[in-house]
Amino acid sequence: MKNTAITKQVQEALLPNNVLQDLLEGNNRFVSGSMQTVDNSALVNQTVGGQFPKAVVLSCIDSRVPVETVLDQAIGDIFVARVAGNFENIDILGSLEYSCKVAGSKLVLVLGHESCGAVKAACDGVE
């Protein structure tokens, strides 16, 4: 059971490759239906005074791709920035920079998905 939040000391020791591997393993757990059980009350209590996410994920706003769920991550594990089509703009860039430079996240992951309506709309509008 996941009942311990990431601490600053744990976050500082993480390497980007290990974080990526953890996210991939989380996605494999989601796909196989063997997601970890989580004690949300414990995690809320532990993160009330601060957060030390291991990664920031840029994802589409598509309601069929709830990032924390498809990566099997718990409260405090990751930052998520969502915008239609995973499009980076100045606001999103600021969030990504904050996540890494200020909050200490070790990895930026861009999470795409199939049949993205925003990407299709952008491609259909090309002249």
Regions picked out by a protein language model, each given a short descriptive name:
Residues 5-87:
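Short, conserved "active-site rim" segments that organize catalytic pockets and cofactor/ligand binding
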Residues 1-2:
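Disordered regulatory segments flanking catalytic cores
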